[in-house]
Amino acid sequence: MHLNTLSPAPGSHKARKRCGRGIGSGIGKTGGRGHKGQKSRSGGSVRPGFEGGQMPLKQRLPKFGFTSRKSLVRAEVRLHELNLITGDVVDIHALKDAGLITRNIVAVKVMLSGEITRPITLRGIAVTKGAQAAIEAAGGKVEE
């Protein structure tokens, strides 16, 4: 057996359809585009959301809500996610290094979800009452 003699099993690779290469191909002449019209022309199509001049759905519906600016710099971390951090001291830099929060986050709060399996020290991170109790029950502590 040599590299130049290798070939796929018969029938395992279907040949691709060659568009517009004669009527025998099954998709010759118009090449699957139908007859005439804007979408049959080269470069001819309408932008996403265009409804032929009718007022588009996006503009017919009212605006609502907004994005809180606080949500862009604050994050929540679940208690069981702290198990992913290797060190004993957990601060914002450790969370960023572990990939649990993005780099633009400046404030973090730990929520009670799951369980912590080892003692850790939280530094400069807010916690809920339940999460604090769970951390202290595991032998850890929370520092402000």
From Swiss-Prot:
Annotated GO biological process: translation
Annotated segments matching region Disordered: 1-58
Swiss-Prot/TrEMBL keywords: Ribonucleoprotein, Ribosomal protein, RNA-binding, rRNA-binding
A GO MF label: rRNA binding
Keyword Endoplasmic reticulum: no
Biased composition annotated in UniProt, kind: Gly residues: 21-31
Source organism superkingdom: Bacteria
InterPro entries: Ribosomal_uL15, Ribosomal_uL15/eL18, Ribosomal_uL15/eL18_sf, Ribosomal_uL15_bac-type, Ribosomal_uL15_CS
Pfam families given in the database record: Ribosomal_L27A (PF00828)
GO (cellular component) term, any one: cytosolic large ribosomal subunit
Family as reported in the entry's similarity comment: Belongs to the universal ribosomal protein uL15 family.
Main function: Binds to the 23S rRNA.
HAMAP family given in the database record: Ribosomal_uL15
Subunit structure comment from the entry: Part of the 50S ribosomal subunit.
Protein name in the entry: Large ribosomal subunit protein uL15
Protein source organism: Colwellia psychrerythraea (strain 34H / ATCC BAA-681)
